[in-house]
Amino acid sequence: MRWILFIGALIGSSICGQEKFFGDQVLRINVRNGDEISKLSQLVNSNNLKLNFWKSPSSFNRPVDVLVPSVSLQAFKSFLRSQGLEYAVTIEDLQALLDNEDDEMQHNEGQERSSNNFNYGAYHSLEAIYHEMDNIAADFPDLARRVKIGHSFENRPMYVLKFSTGKGVRRPAVWLNAGIHSREWISQATAIWTARKIVSDYQRDPAITSILEKMDIFLLPVANPDGYVYTQTQNRLWRKTRSRNPGSSCIGADPNRNWNASFAGKGASDNPCSEVYHGPHANSEVEVKSVVDFIQKHGNFKGFIDLHSYSQLLMYPYGYSVKKAPDAEELDKVARLAAKALASVSGTEYQVGPTCTTVYPASGSSIDWAYDNGIKFAFTFELRDTGTYGFLLPANQIIPTAEETWLGLKTIMEHVRDNLY
């Protein structure tokens, strides 16, 4: 711990409360052994350093990405060199990237106001996404319907689009989830593109047509509305919910550590200031509970797919344990077929495997809860990229990402269609 205190002394108290990103950099650190992983892991839990780990230390074959505030760059780089840790700068000036992103959004908003058309190749506000959900439902009233499933901590509505041919009540269904981690904007953007793709391709594409003839699709494009709004108004890199934690000034919980699946186990924290804080109890976050209640009341979901970013991964249970899921062989086969279909568009390569051994242990996750509650076909996509931009994927990659992801999603849903249980 001595070296942590040493860095803290060098940095001093000037970084306290820093929310700006001028001169902040993202470093990629290549770890080679368990000792190096251990040293970096201790830094993850050192609040005074104000480091933001985008990719946490977990294994030798997985680099560590960390956002370093400008005031701590010199000290942190000195520490890395002193420990013989190799690193490279992947983002030179984070604020410059954010400024470009903001300029693009404002430009797009102006164009959309004048044309009254939704640009699927741009990032949008929560209100714009909800408005487009209304448009989709209005354009295809016999196929799509917007359904309110609950509300957020700050009382924002949570909407899903239900796609159904209307033949039967509580038919077999697939749940598509996105935006549970608010800063992962490519997931929300991919989800709303996917919504339009479903209605546009019905009765044109035999695959999606046959899927909807046999089962329904429920799509939640923004699973963490408060966090998403906060990323656009206060802190672009906010990950958690915006709930209050009694006894702590730190806000929110990680909604993907809050599900009742080995809750409070490995890969989650009991520290409210941690980005992987699991919350006071399972389903404490109203956003999570709304989904849980809806799915349990419905009672006939066969698939659950959660869209995240970044790293280009396609994973399945378990995250909370290294033990193999009973259906691991089938899930792995389906995931590899989906990854192959995805790669056929532009060659984007995805790594496939169970969450725990592919990235890191993660208790309380959505897909583990789904799987443990009888939803056999449970998968997580970590979308583009592998670290060049990380969570700040440029808008010109939205449509290419969505197009390739669609083939992966469709492959999984076809398997669900053909293997209902």
Swiss-Prot record:
Induction: Induced by the histone deacetylase inhibitors trichostatin A and sodium butyrate. The gene is CPA4. Monomer. Interacts with LXN. Metalloprotease that cleaves hydrophobic C-terminal residues with a preference for -Phe, -Leu, -Ile, -Met, -Tyr and -Val. May function in peptide hormone and/or neuropeptide catabolism. It comes from Homo sapiens (Human). Its cofactor is Zn(2+). GO terms for biological process: hormone catabolic process; peptide catabolic process; proteolysis. This is Carboxypeptidase A4. Fetal expression in the adrenal gland, brain, heart, intestine, kidney, liver and lung. Except for fetal brain that shows no imprinting, expression was found preferentially from the maternal allele. Residues 1-16 form the signal peptide. The active site is at E382. Disulfide bonds join C250-C273. One of its GO terms (molecular function) is zinc ion binding. Keywords: Carboxypeptidase, Disulfide bond, Glycoprotein, Hydrolase, Metal-binding, Metalloprotease, Protease, Secreted, Signal, Zinc, Zymogen. Binds 1 zinc ion per subunit. Residues 17-113 form a propeptide. GO terms for cellular component: extracellular space. It is found in: Secreted. Coiled coil: none annotated. SMART domains: Zn_pept. The lineage of its organism: Eukaryota, Metazoa, Chordata, Craniata, Vertebrata. Glycans are attached at N260.
